[in-house]
Swiss-Prot record:
It is found in: Cytoplasm. It comes from Burkholderia vietnamiensis (strain G4 / LMG 22486) (Burkholderia cepacia (strain R1808)). One of its GO terms (molecular function) is ferrochelatase activity. GO terms for cellular component: cytoplasm. This is Ferrochelatase. CDD domains: Ferrochelatase_C, Ferrochelatase_N. GO terms for biological process: heme biosynthetic process. The lineage of its organism: Bacteria, Pseudomonadati, Pseudomonadota, Betaproteobacteria, Burkholderiales.
Length: 354
């Protein structure tokens, strides 16, 4: 096996620490070609689609990519920001926020981000850490709830990159933070901030808050994936923080792909049913998405909104994701700091003479 070329080892670099924030990924441009390239990588991951690859690749290349590439490109174009993809823009802002927060608290660490699919990829980010002399790495997925199709595959990619290194860094992973008090606080603050600006739903009159998480096939729950339970846990803690009951707030799952049964209840049908039942206002918040992206801006903000209004609803509100909110940056910094304990991450304090 050939190993990657590496700089000479340096004892002076032995205490350098890197924190890598990992998100899902995004096409490089809202064009059919770029979207097809991104989807080909994403949907070829056996952690994402658990179908024998010999069968799946034929279907993917001959049917799915040709059909979905152009349609998905139109959706990406509808949400694209002047600075680029929303997911990349917000992830970059989060990275910069955590970097500044840790530096302000005397942490001497390098903070960067990578995408599981697309660029910059995880192997590239780890190689950049290596060139900078980093010998300890904290992998921090931007997925609060653990799932094999998100968290595990991000770790897979990182460990695959390590197999090509002669001089591997020490590695720690953050498995999940679905119930972390700082994360729950940041979620509650995001909802409260939105309501302070746009008015609080009239729950006494029947208005609803819907917490929409990304869906996964139901069989993954039956096979032992903890994702569903952690989503429910996050939802319950957020409801408690907001002082809401299950009559006022409910958990749903979105982004179903294919014909197999996924985690239920599904978001879009739920919103249509609420509209048909006479619910006047529905607010939708996506706690599992730490940055706004196609699934939150287009799917929730446009498609799900239309379902609710078509059902008879009158007022639909999509509450933005955590993005660069100060409470979320603080929560990220707190979670990272907890997982850096035991490593020489902080600047040495000068001794005082009494």
């Amino acid at each position: 096996m050939r190993f990657d070329l590496e700089p000479p080892s340096s004892v002076a670099a032995a205490h350098r620490i890197g924190v890598l924030l990992i998100n899902l990924g995004t096409p490089d441009a809202p064009t059919p070609r770029a979207v097809r390239r991104y989807l080909a990588e994403f949907l070829s991951d056996p952690r994402v689609v658990e179908i024998p690859q010999a069968i799946w690749q034929v279907l993917l290349r001959t049917v799915i990519l040709p059909l979905r590439g152009r349609a998905s490109a139109k959706k990406y174009a509808a949400v694209w920001m002047p600075e680029g993809s929303p997911l990349r823009v917000y992830t970059e802002r989060q990275t910069e926020g955590v970097r500044h927060l840790l530096a302000a608290n005397d942490y001497q660490v390098q903070v960067d981000y990578a995408m599981r699919y697309g660029s910059p990829n995880i192997a590239q980010a780890l190689a950049q850490f290596k060139r900078a002399g980093v010998e300890r790495v904290l992998l921090m997925p931007m997925y609060p709830q653990y799932s094999a199709s998100t968290t595990a595959t991000a770790f897979d990619a990182a460990f695959a990159a390590l197999t090509r290194m002669r001089n591997q860094p020490e590695v720690r992973t953050v498995r999940h933070y679905a119930d972390h008090p700082a994360y729950i606080h940041a979620l509650a603050e995001q909802v409260r901030h939105y309501w302070a600006q746009h008015g609080r739903p009239d729950f006494a009159a029947g208005d609803k808050l819907v917490l929409s998480f990304h869906g996964v096939p139901k069989r993954t729950l039956d096979l032992g994936d903890p994702y569903h339970d952690q989503c429910q846990q996050t939802g319950a803690l957020l409801m408690a923080a907001l002082g809401l009951s299950t009559l006022e707030c409910r958990v749903t799952f979105q982004s179903r792909f294919g014909k197999a049964e996924w985690l239920q209840p599904y978001t879009a049908p739920t919103l249509r049913e609420l509209g048909e039942a006479g619910v006047r206002r529905a607010d939708v918040f996506c706690p599992g998405f730490t940055a706004d992206c196609l699934e939150t801006i287009e799917e929730i903000g446009m498609e799900v909104r239309d379902e609710f209004l078509a059902g008879g609803g009158q007022a639909f509100h999509r509450i933005p994701c955590l993005n660069g909110a100060s409470a979320w940056i603080g929560a990220l910094g707190e979670i990272v700091a907890e997982n850096l304990q035991g490593w020489p991450a902080k600047a040495a304090q000068p001794e005082t003479v009494s």
